[in-house]
Amino acid sequence: MQTRSPLFPSVSSTSRRVCVLACIGVLVASLTACSAPRIAGRAEAEQQPSPCERAYADATANADIMADRSRHIVMRYLAAQEAVSDWANTAAYCPARFADGTLRSAQARHAVRLMASRLAIDIAQPTLSRCDGIDSLDVDTDSLAAMAAAEDQVGFAMEVFAARSFGHATLDISDRHKTTSQRLISLSGAEDNRAKTYDVTQLLANPNTIVDSATGLYAPTDAVLEMNCARSEIAAVAASSTSSNASTKSQTTSDDHSDDSREQSLGMLASMIADRVDLALDWGYPAFDEALFA
């Protein structure tokens, strides 16, 4: 007799497949549970630009508009105004770009002044800041002392020039440099080794124009004095240690506020140094990059 086939010949094999699939599902679920959990907002936070990146991006964008002569002058003027603060923020938030941010902030100030003249907009002339209201700077002692020496030297030269009515020098400008010098040396806490008097023989022999040793270009002597002061101060800041590594600082700050303190200090110094560069440009120092960034 012929053996009859079961009504459901694949039941056992089907059951086995179901069991296998179920086991696979359990394993996958277990592996998923063991994977590293996603931290809410982590990826989003990692994609956010840092203050340095934001400042530099804003600065370069506004600088491009400022330099684009195909745009309306009003748009360029407004972009230049924004670039002044954007570059200053770059100097504060990006220590490696301190020189770039400071010099380009002054360059943007000069552009604002030139375009304001074309637009018949009254704008204040450059004025040297004197560290008024600054109680501390998160910069090492040696760097502050070097800046104090640079201010003292140009202050003496301006005093000599003012006495002889050379260039744009005035006693007020001389006093501002000397006041800044005194403030910086006080903030540094270092021994005061400033010379107070300096050899100005070469300056007196070339009171109108002189060869700028940094570029080899002829420029107004008083403008070169201001520019050299700014260069010395930028070099001093560049050589300064970071807040966490400084062996001696003008004022001790807590670790929780060290970054903010450093940024604020760099911002104040960038603004002060940009005053010197702005004044040099206003007095006729070349404003193109090859001269400024020599």
Language-model segment annotations:
Residues A22-V28:
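Hydrophobic helical h-region of N-terminal Sec-dependent signal peptides
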Residues Q2, S35-A294:
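All-alpha RGS (Regulator of G-protein Signaling) helical domain and cognate RGS-like helical scaffolds
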Residues R4-A22:
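Bacterial N-terminal signal peptides that target proteins for export
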Residues S30-A33:
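C-terminal motif of bacterial Sec signal peptides marking the signal peptidase cleavage site
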Residues Q2-T3, V26:
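Extended, charged helical scaffold/adaptor regions
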